[in-house]
Amino acid sequence: MPSKKMKRRTFVKTAAAVALTPTILNSSTWAGAGRRRSPNQRINVALIGCGKMAKDYHLPELLKQPDVQLVSVCEVDKTRRDFFQNQVNQHYSSGKRNFNGCDAGFDFREIISRADIDAVCIATPDHWHALPLIAACQAGKDVYCEKPLTLTIREAQLCVEAARRNNRVVQTGSQQRSNVFGPFREAVEFIRSGRLGKISRVTIGVGAPSKPCDLPEEAIEPGLEWDMWLGQAPARPFHSDLSPRGMHNHFPSWRSYQEFSGGGHTDMGAHFYDIAQWALDRDQSGPIKVIPPEDVSSNTGARFIYDDGVEMIHGGPSGCVFYGEKGKLHIDRGRLTSDPEEIVKTPLADHEVHLPKSPGHHRNWLDCIESREHPVADVEKGARTVTIAHLGNLAYWHRRAFDFNPETWSFKDPNDNHLLDRPRRAEWQLPEV
């Protein structure tokens, strides 16, 4: 069993062990840099976070990959940790591959320090995304990280820098880019091919921002490392709504609270702002201004202004609605419609935009680990997308507009830059990248 405490200087030393060459390589350079450290020529992967998303999605996806060996699981709840360990061991022991057993612990730092682990899949609550991601990159691991990528704008910037400076392949879990749940790639192809003409606005129908946590204290049962679950968040008593004990089939309510998440706005915004960014060809940039709704009680209606005048609005039907000179297009899970209908009914011609097809979100990540190319939902795409939602939340929480510089990841008014991050407990400060 891993030790419960690891001093921060040990964590920083471990996390920074290979961060000695801050060279940023382009995709063509990466393509010749493929590597396999595993003696059995498989990619040794550790799963960090064993909740519902990991149980329903990541675990089965990883176990079915022939070139992956899931060698470790990390989870603060002992019941879930044991369940995942048993699932992995049963899966591999029933096959013919050479398997030495999957280990389990609750401290991600001990996993990241292991030389035999090539990559990590992070499926923790939102406030526990950035630190393991950055540390994994600095320790030479490739990363798949659930969306929304971060809790703050500063974390988003550092995740990109950590990946680039350490030449890591980092996939954001915005799997709609791999056409999971609907024809999202096709919608983007229609828009980029000019089927709508010049785009004037986009509406994004997703949930509301989070609120301060006001849950009462509950008695905690043995088997949960509650202080580790809190991590950077302020110390507070346990409540089962935040981390239900054992295995469960629902999404816990930590997403509703500011201390741990940006709410439905970042949760589903990480999917649909992402599709809007993709369609607008803004994957390396973002809006320059956010304006809150006039109704001070409203949690929808924030407006995001791009430097070319395109306006994105939080609100409207579920998914994304694009409005252009020649009509409109609505893309949502299981739905792609347009007015006029011919916009999406007419097949793409050879001369129009055809984007690469992803073989699946995990498969794309694993293939890129070999090729050293950027995956379909590369870390910067995820970082730029979540920054939009963070800007919107700041506009809602403070009921004011902000001017933002996407190139510097900072506000035009330096007096606002303290809002790029938030206070965090001493043990969990952001490392130098």
Regions found by a protein language model. Name each.
Residues 15-19, 23, 30, 243, ...:
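C-terminal helical cap and adjacent loop that interface with cofactors, partners, or active-site loops
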Residues 49, 195-212, 225-227, 231-239, ...:
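NAD(P)-dependent dehydrogenases' Rossmann-like dinucleotide-binding region
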Residues 150-228:
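A contiguous active-site-proximal alpha/beta segment in oxidoreductase catalytic domains
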Residues 180-204, 216, 257-259, 266-292, ...:
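Oxidoreductase and adenylate-handling cofactor-binding alpha/beta cores
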Residues 147:
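Short basic (Lys/Arg) and small-residue
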Residues 12, 59, 82-85, 109-112, ...:
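Non-transmembrane alpha-helical segments in soluble domains
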Residues 2-142, 154-169:
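N-terminal glycine-/serine-/threonine-rich beta1-alpha1-beta2 phosphate-ribose binding loop
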Residues 168, 211, 252-262:
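Flexible glycine/proline-enriched surface loops and loop-helix/loop-strand junctions
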